[in-house]
């Protein structure tokens, strides 16, 4: 049990300056110091910097069984998770089987609202009726002991490919390919689920060559599938270092040339310049639409977008995902609006609480993480939102079954929590663990389930747990202090040598002191975004922040009064034009 929960206040300081050259300083700040380290980071090599796939546990077993199934024409089931890692992973193995001329398989993606995460007995029985002999999981399975035993009893061999932590030992599967296995000797422990599938494909290709029976496609053609690997790696927010950096780097290269109809149509619809697509385009534009499929309907819709071979079909799924993503935005906005009203009423009647706990049985659990994040950012405290799953989402024919909610399930509330950046949520929930059925997540985000009769005591339990907070005011280290005159095409080009950015390789953070916000503007359909022109007297640059109000920064941001800005530097490509600008992080 964690006895202390750390509350962090934002305090900025600049990392020690070692080099005048910006790129050298940024590399040094990331612990990249030797010439060999610099070369490896700045020049990812697809051959030299990827590990042997057979270093993954059980890879030989998995490859042997899959090759046997392909040779004998056995029917294979591919069971993947419903998120923006699992769906591309399912599409990846789908496309690989098509590439080698194997068609006797089916993709199964569970309904998020009805079946939930991982394997389930109803779905396995559906696959057994479809005469599946080999079941391959993607981005799930490592904890599904009972379900895998059930699949075996129904005559299936099971190969698990996953990247999550094991629990209570390993399931009795034929093969478990997972870099996080306790006995794994694989050099990289954190790769996404689709990344594990890519390693499986590489192993299958190498094994076929070694056996003198190479697959019937031109050497290197499989690399066109890296667009899905890059998409999933960036979507799943794994650390973009080591092998992940290589996969993301080359994944983006392939995405910029992608022949995938669905993605090309999606880029066009969103006015994304495919030649300049970045990790931000993936994270803010593409990933939400893939995730919208499971949150608002069925994940199969996103899968069909990624695997579409007909232009009309691809166009239809682009429009559908865009529509349900817009519906998702409206629903999240509605939840946020209702939650704010409840918060205001509670403050008026009970006073302010250090933890916000709110819910409504009509709120859809799949949307609550997005809503909780918005509220936590505005109110600067941990937020726990709960709702109840509704068992009404139809299944797509051939990809799943259906089930009715049991009385026990109807009595369970599910929710999401988000931190304001100050409180470790897992530690907080650990102290109040007797109130949950289950919980999990990370320091800043998590999920939980709770019995209906216990929801009314959850707020008090979390508030009591939050009394074990120590304020140590840690510093946020900034890469460098710059002036507006330092921003140029050349400096941006230097910074972008470090891309792609993400977890483990965050965008460089800079401080700009004593700059003047000349004009503060709002933009967007509902004026939900912020745009500011900054001047130092000689130079002017635009800075933006999405879904932000100037009021959030208090007295630190006033038009016509000099301020200190913490920001990233970026180059934006949109609708055929480019712009160097700042992305606002904070003011002080």
Where are these regions (language model features)?
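Short, positively charged and aromatic/hydrophobic N-terminal segments
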Residues: 3-4
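Hydrophobic helix-and-loop "lid/oligomerization" segment in the mid-to-C-terminal part
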Residues: 7-9, 15-134, 154-155, 172, ...
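Short amphipathic alpha-helical segments and helix-helix/interface helices
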Residues: 66, 124, 148-149, 554
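Mid-to-C-terminal polyanion-binding domains and interfaces
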Residues: 68-72, 313-317, 323-358, 411, ...
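Active-site cavity-forming subdomains of large catalytic enzyme subunits
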Residues: 128-194, 198-207, 241
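A short acidic, amphipathic alpha-helical/loop segment
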Residues: 146-150, 371-374, 494
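Histidine-centered active-site/metal-ligand motif
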Residues: 163-164, 364, 442, 529
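Cationic, low-complexity basic patches in intrinsically disordered or flexible, solvent-exposed regions
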Residues: 214
